[in-house]
Amino acid sequence: MHIHILGICGTFMGGAAILARQLGHKVTGSDANVYPPMSTLLESQGIEIIEGFDPSQLNPAPDLVVIGNAMSRGNPCVEYVLNHNLRYTSGPQWLQEFLLHERWVLAVSGTHGKTTTSSMLAWILEDCGYQPGFLVGGVLGNFGVSARLGESMFFVVEADEYDSAFFDKRSKFVHYHPRTLIMNNLEFDHADIFDDLEAIKRQFHHLVRTVPGNGRILAPKQDAALTDVLSRGCWSDQEFSGQDGEWQAVKLSKDGSHFEVWLQGEQVGTVQWDLVGDHNVDNALMAIAAARHVGVTPDLACEALGRFINTKRRLELKGEINGVAVYDDFAHHPTAIELTLAGLRNKVGDKKIIAVLEPRSATMKRGVHKETLAASLKQADEVFLYQPESIAWSVQDVAAQCQQPAFTSDNIDQFVANIAQRAEAGTQILVMSNGGFEGIHGKLLTALENSTR
């Protein structure tokens, strides 16, 4: 079958393309911006990529067009597909029909921690000999790829609540039909498609409805929003983590790099790893619990996590120059920002932390979280806020609310120079954005190298 993918360079669609190729299909695709690393990865799989959306790419017609959720009416290829009655579907629907319907699906959902927890779970299964397939929104550190078919019935998928396509406004995850479902947490996000938290809760309950009676749902006991979702009806076995839950963690180190795992009042394992932060301890509990549902004992899961390499862009050290460390993190929501900073603070103690933030997500651009942003940055000693052209509100408003020194700029080169000037030996620079941030990491490392300080 010839499958053509519109919007192929997105993380999800790129992963779907790799899976389609591994299934033996001829795969082509197009996108507005074709660039490495995704373009290189796809081409290495024998996938032809076309830049732009000239409808001529659809002649002769492929057997199926998979339309990414970034595509909308008015796109030349979309209009051609509709006008010529070509067979089309969404990415999540394709995944279900061509792959997931034959698998034991382990889905990881929630506002935060999906990619990291999915990666942990995939690695636990791999390390314990289960050879799972997976599709995750990031490059898995232990695998070097974001998707693979796997050699067993088990398939780990990052279950996103974002909409499926312009013609299917349901959340992606309602297509996945998991037997094992992790719901990590739930807060308001994606203000571009959801009006309020209640709208997201409805989608999460649609997801709960798809889990079979012999399935299992895993969630934190103290998350009020998820408690509300489950109270609307649940027909599957449930296990909970945290206070009053079956699964608990006892930290043996302040930064979360060493902790015990307890199940129903009994210690069942110990994790010692390179990750830090209470949020990662919580993620680990969920991954261990999900792996247990398919047969992995907690002690083996804990041992596997000791060999876990985190996904790129999760407190990833990009380099260290003259004693100044530069980290990259995907955090783009106040809760994630606060947790990431807390993890770094516990790791480095009293060392100076400079938080560098680009408010780039669709929700951030609308200013939805700007009132809580300053408080989320409280663990930083200094704050640098970038003013992208694409947002209508001023980051100066957030800077004014910060208790620590806070600086703003709309010029990336001046911004980098100012950060480098404030750094000294021992400083930890944490860059947070869900985009490329105009290559700031490389620019910072260059500026630090050129610095005489």
Protein language model features and the residues they cover:
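Short, polar loop motifs at secondary-structure junctions
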Residues: 32-35, 53-55, 71-72, 221-225, ...
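Acidic-glycine-rich active-site phosphate/pyrophosphate-binding loop
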Residues: 251-269
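C-terminal accessory "lid"/substrate-recognition subdomains
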Residues: 260, 279-280
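ATP-dependent carboxylate-amine ligase
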Residues: 1-34, 43-49, 61, 65, ...
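Generic structural signal for helix capping and beta-alpha/helix-loop junctions
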Residues: 37, 59, 98, 142-143, ...
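Phosphate-binding loop of NTP-binding sites
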Residues: 19-22, 43, 57-60, 69, ...
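General beta-strand structural signal in soluble alpha/beta enzymes
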Residues: 28-31, 50-51, 88-91, 108, ...
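Beta-strand->loop->alpha-helix junctions that form or flank phosphate-binding loops
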Residues: 50-53, 91-96, 134-138, 233-254, ...
